[in-house]
Structures are given as C-alpha cells and as structure tokens.
Amino acid sequence: MVSIRNPPEWGIEPVPSKHRFLRGIDYFVLWSSLGVGLLVFSAGSFLTGARFEDAVLAIILGSVGGSFLLALAGKIGSDNAIPSIISTRPSFGIHGAYLPAILNVMQLVGWTTFEIMIMSKAAEMLLGKLIPYYIWTILIGTFVAMLGVAGPLTVIKNWLGKFAVWISYASSLIIIIHLATTGVFSKVLLSSGSGISFFSGLDIVIAMPISWIPLAADYNRFAKTSKTAFRGTFIGFTLTNILFYFGGLMLGVSDVVGIITAIQSIFFGFLLLILLVDEADNAFADVYSATVSTQTINRKIKQHYLIISFTILSIILSMSISIADYETFILLIGALFVPLFGVVLSDYYIVKHRRYTPSMLYGRDALKIGYPAIAAWSAGVLLYYLLSSLSPIYISSWPAIGATIPSFIISALLYIGMMKSKQRGYLLKKA
C-alpha cells in the first residue's frame, strides 16, 4: 500500500515513479471537481444573450474542445512527470519561463483571493451575518492552507475521492434539476437571444477549461499512466463544465453575489453550504500551483512556507478588494496564458514530436531564452486584447468572433512557422 501521509518536497523535479500512482478515476474526480464552481454559473449566464440552440451547441463544443486542450497540457506533465511551468522551458527557455511563472503566481493569488471572497460572502449571507465577513476569510483561508500543506496526493485521495466530490455531485444535480423544473427552462428555451453570436458564446465556454491549463501538469505529473490521466481529465472536466454552464444559462444571473442569493433560496441554503465545501478545492489548486510556479524561480524555498504566505496574502486581499473589480483584473491576466499554451502545446506535440529530455528541461541543453516563443506569444496576446471586450484596447468594430480561439491559433501557427523556418535554415547551413 502506498503511503500518502507526508507529501514529498521535490518541488519542480520529476516526480519519482513510486509517487506516481494516481489512476484515471482519481483524475476524473479531481478535474470534475475543479469544473464545479460559482464562477462557472456566472460565465454560463452570459449565454442568455444567445439563441438557445446556439448556446447549447457552444456549451457542448466549447466544453469538449477546451477540455481536450486541458488534457493535452496535463499529458505533458504525465509523460515527463514535470509541473506546468517547467513544461514551458523547451520553448521559452529557462530564463524566458520566469515571466510566465511570475504572471502565473499573480493570477493564482488572484484566483485564491477570489475563491476566498465568494466562499466568505456566501457563508456570511447563509448565516445572516452572525459571523463577520473578515472572520470567515480567516477561517476559510486557514482551511485552504491546510489543504495546500497536505498536498495534492492527500487532497485527491482522501478529501475529494472519499468525501467532497460526491456531495458536490449530488448538490449540483439537485440544483440543475430544480432550475429545469421550475419554469426557468421554458423561458430560456423560447428565448430568441439578444445579439451574442455562436462564436462569441463558444469563446465564453472554452475560456473556462483553458483557464486551468497553466495548472494541469502540476497535478497530472502524479499519474500512473498518461493514457488514463488524459481520459479522466478530459471526461471529468467536460461533464461538469457542460452541467454548470447549462445551469448558469438557466439561472441567468451573472453577478456572483446574485448567484449566491439565487442558490441560497433553494432548500433553505443547504445546497449552497454543500457546494461551498467543494469550492475550497479550487482555492487549494490555485495556491498549490502558485507555490510550484514560484519554485521554478527559486527551488530552495519550502512549499509549506510559500503556501502559508500566499494564503495569508489572499486573505488580506479578500478583505480589501471588491469582487467585481478584481474579477476583471484576473481575467485579463489569465488571458495571457491562452496564447502562451498555444506555443507550448504546439512545441511539444508538433515541433518536438512529444520528445522532451531531462537535459532540455533542467540541464545543459536547456535554452536560456526562446525568442521565437516569446514573439509568437506576444502576437497572440496582442490579438487577444484587441478582440476581448474586457480589454482597454478592444476594437469594437471588428467582427465578434471571440478572443480565446483566435489568439490560441495565431500564436501556435506563428511559433510553428518560425521553428520550421529556423530548422530549414539550420539544415541549409549544414549542407
């Protein structure tokens, strides 16, 4: 029997084979759990502006396509037993990967703050402000830190697998069934939409699984086999993403506090309380991955020190920043990783043909700075911000085709083109 009581502290090094024992069902549990969240309800509500058939098609195709990319990113981790930011080194270089690491820490501290905010707000509303909001942030933050220190193996096997995910499934299904049988569904079904195109809807849906890509390998590196981890990741996230986007479509409330109020009215708030139990694992995943990303810059810092420090910072931020303002900020930072992983995935699966060696990741053959990757990434980021309505440089006169898919594709194609050109130049010189 494998012991998982004391999480090892190898940090960014390849995971030893004796600790790579998570199965496909474990990844189904993990990623289906991470697909559950109040934020997904919020995102789903934006689809009420589309025709019903367009919204449903966007939910299905966006969830399948986005989850496939998520599973591909996780497979780099399970193939090589490495965390996410290390997987950027063969394309961006050791020093070039520092910028993605810093940005990832920023966005993950942001998401941890956001999760603590909404869990604390929900708990405060549920108990009628019997316990002040700031006390809830401390209590919930402490619990998140405990999960982080316990580590992913313990959280997946003992917390999610044995307890949290199952009550989350039950409460989620009850909420969806309630929404579908109370007259809300018929209103959505008959809606003619208010101008959101299919492609804009697809962009809204695919953005959620893609937002988890910078974290995927941090957890999938513990897989016993890549094939089962890929299946568990893909199926698990696809199912819950479809379920919660459809729930958000029926709920029709985009404001997170409004969603909390709406769910609170179902079964006297009991289901909201259960849902909050599962929401904690999202915060755990954020704070743990922030720690691993930091260790790619300085591997000597102990994980538990970083986890506690990032959680304290998130608690302080959650007491001093409004939910609405902060959500837009972290969404804009998170958008940077869409074209970044367009580069990383194309490098691993197309340019390098799924062959990363330890020397490319850690040793003397590792790049210092990958200029083609940085150039392709920069072009993708610029395109994203030109196409995103959240961006200060958004061009409203351009066609509403969304920002996620175009920026991902353009960064991938540019990188592949530059690398193929570089390889041809090398061969010509050699000849």
Task: Give a label for each model feature.
Residues 1-53, 197-202, 220-231, 418-431:
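Membrane-interface "cap" regions at the ends of multi-pass membrane proteins
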Residues 14, 343-417, 421-431:
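C-terminal membrane-solvent junction of multi-pass transporters and transport-like membrane proteins
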Residues 24-40, 176-183, 190-251, 262-284, ...:
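Hydrophobic, membrane-embedded alpha-helices of multi-pass small-molecule transporters
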Residues 45-49, 75, 118-128, 141-163, ...:
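Membrane-water interface regions at transmembrane-helix termini and the short interhelical loops
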Residues 45-75, 96-98, 238, 406:
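Extracellular loop-to-transmembrane helix junctions
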Residues 97-130, 280-296:
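Hydrophobic transmembrane alpha-helices that form the core helical bundles
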Residues 100-105, 116, 127-152, 166-176, ...:
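Transmembrane alpha-helical segments of multi-pass small-molecule transport proteins
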Residues 120, 135-179, 192-193, 233-237, ...:
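Membrane-interface loop-to-helix entry segments
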